[in-house]
Amino acid sequence: MTRTATPAMLTAPTLPQALRNGINAHAAAQLQVDIAPYPGMEEGDLIELFWNNCFAASRRITACRIGQPTRLRIPQSFVLDGPAHVHYQVMQIGHGPARSATTQVRVKTDCPGGQPPAVYSDENQNLAPVGLPETIRRQGVNSRQVHRGVPLTIEPYPNMSSGDAITLRWGDVRMDLPKVTAKGVGLTVQVWVPSSVIIEGGDDCRLEVTYCVLDRVGNNSRWAPTRTLRIAPLLPTRPATATPVYQPRPLG
């Protein structure tokens, strides 16, 4: 006889690959869901997993799995961009189905800069190289600019979104830029490369400058095509000339 009492709600499932409640393209391909052990767990229990209220997977509990977490996989065809609600229910003999609380996540599989065309390349041709003043592009960075710093720009890129984190690479030096804001989406990113970064990068006749983008759920753009610059050696600054002190001529 089936009991009619409503069982207590079970704990929500967890998604170990989620980053800030988001699912990226890599995770979506093999998305896993963990279900914690629950009170009264018995051999023969049937766990059914639901993605946006659609049945996605199930697992029958065996004797050796009692008291252990259960891991299920969501088919990739279910994992579409946008918000998703994940829950499960437990079916036990002689009991009504016990439902869990719901976990909410957001799926984002569109990478910053779009999908790179070459699988085996570290470069994304969908990203524009950094923009620099024409004189710097032609003549390089002179000693005065090394001391002062230089401006550059990053053009808007495909799938640009709020929360994107851009990392500039100046030679072997990396510089993290402020995250893209909602107002900044679709706009050119203005960057000032400070003297400290240029000096640390050192003088070079072919220094490479590039950048990459990591979105809020961990999708990576790969590196933009590089811009090659000549960096002049750092000239020492002139020491300040001491002000002469008046010395009165001795009498006699």
Predicted region positions:
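Intrinsically disordered, low-complexity linker/tail regions enriched in polar/charged residues
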Residues: M1-G252
